[in-house]
Swiss-Prot record:
GO process annotations (BP): monoatomic ion transport
Protein name: Putative antiporter subunit mnhC2
Signal peptide: none
Assigned keywords, A-Z: Antiport, Cell membrane, Ion transport, Membrane, Transmembrane, Transmembrane helix, Transport
Subunit-structure text: May form a heterooligomeric complex that consists of seven subunits: mnhA2, mnhB2, mnhC2, mnhD2, mnhE2, mnhF2 and mnhG2.
Subcellular location: Cell membrane
Positions of transmembrane segments: 3-23, 25-45, 72-92
Gene that this polypeptide is encoded by: mnhC2
Protein family: Belongs to the CPA3 antiporters (TC 2.A.63) subunit C family.
Pfam families documented for this protein: Oxidored_q2 (PF00420)
GO cellular component, one term: plasma membrane
UniProt organism field: Staphylococcus epidermidis (strain ATCC 35984 / DSM 28319 / BCRC 17069 / CCUG 31568 / BM 3577 / RP62A)
Amino acid sequence: MNLILLLVIGFLVFIGTYMILSINLIRIVIGISIYTHAGNLIIMSMGKYGPHMSEPLIQGHAQNFVDPLLQAIVLTAIVIGFGMTAFLLVLIYRTYRVTKEDEISALKGDEDDE
């Protein structure tokens, strides 16, 4: 299971890097979102998980608990990532409405504009 999770995280990092290096602004935002998901998986993989683990809410005697702190951190990271993605999409939308361009190379401007 750890090998599969490691391969999924590596694949997400690869795809995120590929998308961030493109010149289209929407692809860059999608790449940043994929990086966020890869980071969340890395944080979740640090905790103990599996079918033999139990919730920390059991009244009786339980030995193996899942760490709830990592789940809280990932939940917070998901909310922050969603807010960041929404802000970047609105920023790109506004930039497109003003400049009619959605590529980074077109947004550099001319040398005469300085």
